[in-house]
Amino acid sequence: MRGLAMRLPPRLALSVLAGRGPSCILGSGAATRKDWQERNRRSFSDLYTQPLPDCDFEESSSWTHKSRSEPTRHIACKKSARNLVRDLLEHQNPSHQLILECNPGPGILTGALLKAGARVVAFESEKMFIPHLESLRKNADGELQVVHCDFFKIDPRYQELVRPDVNSHTIFQNLGIKAVPWSAGVPIKVFGILPNKHERRLLWKILFDLYSCESIYRYGRVELNMFISEKEFRKLIATPKRPDLYQVLGVLWQVACEIKFLHMEPWSSFSVHAENGHLEKSKHSESLNLLKQNLYLVRMTPRRTLFTENLSPLNYDMFFHLVKHCFGKRNAPIIHHLRSLSTVDPINILRQIRKRPGDTAAKMYPHDFKRLFETIERSEDSVFKWIYDYCSDDSEL
C-alpha cells in the first residue's frame, strides 16, 4: 500500500507528512506560527521537520510487555458461532475468503468457519490453546494456519514496547498473503473481540494504521468485524444529533469506513479465560463483573474513496489535527478555528463547502470535515496551507 502514496501527484510532497507515521510534518506545507511570521526572512530550503505529537497515543504502554492483566472472552456457544459464520461469509464463496481470527481460544468459531469452507489464520496469544488449534490445523487440509501471537499487539507504534517485536510484514510474508490495490475488493477479513480495558486505545491505534496504510492496511482495504462495548459503539456512530457522544474518534472512523452494526451478542454467549488459566462461564464468575455486558458486532470496511489527491496516507496527520482542533472548542464558530489552523481565506473556504461563518464544529458531520480539509488542501492561495502551534496543548481525547 505504500505504492498508493508514492503514485500521488508530486505537489502533495510539499504539504504532507515526512518521516515515519504521524510523528513529524514537513514545513513546506505546514508551518508553526513563528515560521509564518518569519516567512519573508527565510528561504524555502530553510524549512525543517517538526514533531507532531501523537497525543491520543500517549497512554502508558506498560501493558504491552506485561502478561495479560485482564481476562479475555471467547465464543463459547456453537449457535452463536454459526451466526457469526453467516455474518462473516455472507453470500460469498467461502473458499475465496481469508479470515484472520484474533484469540480464538478453544476454537469453536474456528471449527465452524472451517466447516463452512473458509480459509482461516488463527492468531492466538495463550499457549494453552495452541495444541488444540494445531490439532484442528492437521485435519483442515491446509485451510487453517496457527500463529502464536497477540494480533492486537502486532506492529507496535512508537511509544510501545513489545517483546518480542511482532511484525505483520514478516507474518504475512510467511503466510503467503500478498497486497492488493486499495481500489480492489476486500482481501482479508479480521474477526476479534476488543479487550475491554484497552478498547478505545486500540481503536485509535487501528485508525492510525488505516489512514497511514501501515500494518495490515499495507495489504489493501482490510475489513474489521469486531465485538465492541455498547458505549464505544454508540460513540463510533454518533452524529451531531447526539452531541453528548459525538467525538473526534467517531468522526475519523466514519470518514474512513462504512460502519455497519451486525448484531448484539449477550454476555452469556462468551466464555472467559482468566489469568489463572481456568476457563469459566461468565455467569459463574463474580470477579469478572466488568465482562458481564452485551457486545456489539460491528463491521468496519474502509471506503474505496477514502484517499484522494488532497487526503492521502502522507498528509492525514494534518486532517487529524484539524478535527481535534475543532473539537477542542466545539461550540466556537468554525471560522475561528480556520483562522488558527490555516493561512487560506476562511470566508472563501466556507463558501466553497456551503457553510456559514457562524456554523460550529459540533454541527458539522464527518463528511463535512473531509470536504473542509480537502478544500483547504486544494486551495492555491498560499504555499503554506497550515499553521501548527507547536506550543498548543493537544490534550488527549
UniProtKB/Swiss-Prot annotation:
Localization terms from the record: Mitochondrion
GO molecular function, one term: rRNA (adenine-N6-)-methyltransferase activity
Assembly mode: Homodimer. Component of the mitochondrial transcription initiation complex, composed at least of TFB2M, TFAM and POLRMT. In this complex TFAM recruits POLRMT to the promoter whereas TFB2M induces structural changes in POLRMT to enable promoter opening and trapping of the DNA non-template strand. Interacts with mitochondrial RNA polymerase POLRMT. Interacts with TFAM.
One Pfam family here: RrnaAD
GO CC annotation terms, alphabetical: mitochondrial matrix; mitochondrial nucleoid
Protein name per Swiss-Prot or TrEMBL: Dimethyladenosine transferase 2, mitochondrial
Transcription found in the keyword field: yes
Family matches, as SMART domains: rADc
Record has Transcription regulation as a keyword: yes
Purpose of the protein: S-adenosyl-L-methionine-dependent rRNA methyltransferase which may methylate two specific adjacent adenosines in the loop of a conserved hairpin near the 3'-end of 12S mitochondrial rRNA. Component of the mitochondrial transcription initiation complex, composed at least of TFB2M, TFAM and POLRMT that is required for basal transcription of mitochondrial DNA. In this complex TFAM recruits POLRMT to a specific promoter whereas TFB2M induces structural changes in POLRMT to enable promoter opening and trapping of the DNA non-template strand.
DNA-binding: annotated segments: 329-330
Binding site for S-adenosyl-L-methionine: I75, E124, D150
InterPro entries, per the entry: KsgA/Erm, rRNA_Ade_methylase_Trfase_N, SAM-dependent_MTases_sf
Family: Belongs to the class I-like SAM-binding methyltransferase superfamily. rRNA adenine N(6)-methyltransferase family. KsgA subfamily.
Extent of the transit peptide: 1-44
Keywords, comma-separated and alphabetical: Methyltransferase, Mitochondrion, RNA-binding, rRNA processing, S-adenosyl-L-methionine, Transcription, Transcription regulation, Transferase, Transit peptide
This enzyme's EC code(s): 2.1.1.-
GO biological process: mitochondrial transcription; rRNA methylation; transcription initiation at mitochondrial promoter
Catalysed reactions, semicolon-separated: adenosine in rRNA + S-adenosyl-L-methionine = N(6)-methyladenosine in rRNA + S-adenosyl-L-homocysteine + H(+)
